[in-house]
Amino acid sequence: MINLRKTHPLMKIINHSFIDLPAPSNISAWWNFGSLLGICLVIQILTGLFLAMHYTSDTLTAFSSVAHICRDVNYGWLIRNLHANGTSMFFMCLFLHVGRGIYYGSYLYKETWNIGVILLLTVMATAFVGYVLPWGQMSFWGATVITNLLSAIPYIGTTLAEWIWGGFAVDKATLTRFFAFHFILPFIIMALVIVHLLFLHETGSNNPSGINPDSDKIPFHPYYTIKDALGLMFLLLILLSLAFFSPDSLGDPDNFSPANPLNTPPHIKPEWYFLFAYAILRSIPNKLGGVLALLASILILLIIPFLHTANQRSMMFRPISQTLFWILTANLITLTWIGGQPVEQPFIIIGQLASILYFTLILILLPLAGLFENYMLEPQR
């Protein structure tokens, strides 16, 4: 009998992508996060679908519809907690996935990397519009502050902001369209994920050593399906622990109050996964300058492949670059902390120094370290 998975047109695609896929024999647990992101996306789409069945995107009823989901819908509290905390898990996996790509030189697969950066931006946009939907205080003021940044664009800024709002301020029209965006974007993300995998399977996976692994490949199944299953169990353990025992620990207490345009919260701040970019935005006193720095903090990922100066692909055998990478990691954690602090000294100066260091590390120090390591590895006369 002919093996169906190798002959059936649909099964053949799945077989070449997840079963008989030749994978490097030495990829570590850092390569688990791609599959975990796929699982996170599926969890978010499924829980989101059930939430959308009971949610109403109207300024008068949005907040109470979320309360209704938690109180009256069967397991509504669980669906909502999984969806809210699933976002945090999604971003945790995203940051680790991007960090892995930078550390091991995966960005040299330029098409895969660029689609990945577009995916990151799309996920950030989806999370932002989703945060507005419960229509709590922080939802409303977060939407107001972030959409207001568009007005910093010269000449067309104010018109653009009002066009996004559908009026002269964040109101019913804004909430309705944000719900529409939040519903459609995950499906666009799914399409982009397929393109991301398509480009990845053109070249094959990178590996920790950064050298060509063609001479030593093993089938994806059962070796890496088992390994991914272990990662999935850890992910679900953390997500379910959060959802059951501490569902509100990552949220903002202000969001338990319904949106009130007449009362501004003392500290307007986004969810934790945006705080590093928010800190960079706030570190520049000029509005337009802040917006440009905010965009640059993410879009800088697109030029990382062109800043690679080292003869070796991975940082595995490059101690100076390794040190700078971990300084960059610590710097991003510092920025995340600063983004959640009030705008006063010493937080202002720490944020400004951390923002300067962020761009200096990526644009200047890491490329220089690559060149220096090349020089050190050359045979000395």
UniProtKB/Swiss-Prot annotation:
Please give the name of this protein: Cytochrome b
**Name of encoding gene:** MT-CYB
What InterPro entries does the entry give? Cyt_b/b6_C, Cyt_b/b6_C_sf, Cyt_b/b6_N, Cytb/b6-like_sf, Cytochrome_b, Cytochrome_b_C_euk/bac, Cytochrome_b_N_euk/bac, Di-haem_cyt_TM
Q: Which UniProt keywords apply?
A: Electron transport, Heme, Iron, Membrane, Metal-binding, Mitochondrion, Mitochondrion inner membrane, Respiratory chain, Transmembrane, Transmembrane helix, Transport, Ubiquinone
Compartments reported by the entry: Mitochondrion inner membrane
Cofactor(s) demanded? heme b
GO biological process entries:
mitochondrial electron transport, ubiquinol to cytochrome c
Main subcellular location: mitochondrion
Membrane topology type: Multi-pass membrane protein
**Positions annotated to bind a ubiquinone:** 201
Residues binding heme b b566 are 97, 196
Which family does this protein fall into?
A: Belongs to the cytochrome b family.
Instruction: List S-S links within the chain.
Output: none
Q: Name one GO cellular component term.
A: mitochondrial inner membrane
Fill in the subunit field for this protein.
The cytochrome bc1 complex contains 11 subunits: 3 respiratory subunits (MT-CYB, CYC1 and UQCRFS1), 2 core proteins (UQCRC1 and UQCRC2) and 6 low-molecular weight proteins (UQCRH/QCR6, UQCRB/QCR7, UQCRQ/QCR8, UQCR10/QCR9, UQCR11/QCR10 and a cleavage product of UQCRFS1). This cytochrome bc1 complex then forms a dimer.
* Protein role: Component of the ubiquinol-cytochrome c reductase complex (complex III or cytochrome b-c1 complex) that is part of the mitochondrial respiratory chain. The b-c1 complex mediates electron transfer from ubiquinol to cytochrome c. Contributes to the generation of a proton gradient across the mitochondrial membrane that is then used for ATP synthesis.
Further comment: Heme 1 (or BL or b562) is low-potential and absorbs at about 562 nm, and heme 2 (or BH or b566) is high-potential and absorbs at about 566 nm.
Record: residues binding heme b b562? 83, 182
Could you tell me the superkingdom of the organism this chain comes from? Eukaryota
UniProt cross-references to CDD domains, sorted A to Z: cytochrome_b_C, Cytochrome_b_N
Paste the cofactor note.
Answer: Binds 2 heme b groups non-covalently.
The molecular function GO annotations come to: metal ion binding; ubiquinol-cytochrome-c reductase activity
Residues annotated as transmembrane? 33-53, 77-98, 113-133, 178-198, 226-246, 288-308, 320-340, 347-367
